Amino acid sequence: EGLGKVLRYGAYDDEVLARLRWMEKTLAPALSRALAAHGPLDLRSLIAQALQMGDEVHNRNRAATSLLIRALAPHLVRTGADADETAAVLRFLDGNDHFFLNLSMAASKCSLDPAAGIPGSSMIAVMARNGTDFGIQVAALPGRWFTAPAPMVDGLYLPGFTAADAAPDIGDSVITETAG
């Protein structure tokens, strides 16, 4: 979805819904075709390169997103429904520096899951926030949550909003911080 006026930040209007519908009807099928043509993506390699380029693949994903576009662009062009649609998909990806975040989150979770159940391990294997609680799971104790109240975030707000409008910390992307 990107940054700014998006559903995950609490925005919900016709513009947000139109973008989500476009993502469902146009972006997802285009990416599906391109991925089928490309074959499996080596996310570990993309992340390693992005880290060397200054990303930390949570709040900064510019390099990782650019590397992803570089990998998929030829396949988007080759499998695209038409030139205008392909151009719109590439513009969306290019204008969304956070596009890689979802892939980073999945890669982080997959890399951490094998740690679950290692006897005696004090490694933090999961961190999560749901707007009410902040929780962790320790590798030696899979499935057992240690929780505390989710803190309020001192962050930036969309125009017209203040800290009084905010909810406590929420989101699954903290799994990237768990992975380091």
Q: Which residues does each PLM region occupy?
A:
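Conserved phosphate/anionic-ligand binding catalytic regions in large, soluble enzymes, centered on
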Residues: D169-A179
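Accessory "access/gating" subregions that flank catalytic or transport cores
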Residues: V57-P168
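Small-residue-rich
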Residues: E1-A63
